[in-house]
């Protein structure tokens, strides 16, 4: 959508790029072997320059299983039409369970460990958080790809440390 605004005419030399593609350009990736993840591709995927699974695997490693189907949130669908959203959610839950089984069978996620599902959409993140207690072995943890990367690269306290540095001017 932003491509239609022709920002380069207002700001010559500027370009619009997704954060995931920017991180790849800068060579910021997770070291290989950092565990397994489910990936939920949003209906409105911000990754426009290439195959999103290729981008995700380049960022966080090859141990990623794509979790198909809509999360059921679809903007405000979960709130405005819970009857429809619940049916969509049921199908997504089946996909999450399949992905969980694949990750556990491959050994990338231990039998008693939580499964992480990553996305890049705020609405989807809200929807995916609704599945938190639905797995049989452990919980489903939903987060953004870039947040998971920040946690693994900078540590669990990356956000308060970042805020503190920003408040101090740098």
Where are the language model's segments positioned?
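Iron-sulfur cluster-binding electron-transfer modules in prokaryotic oxidoreductases
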Residues: 1-170
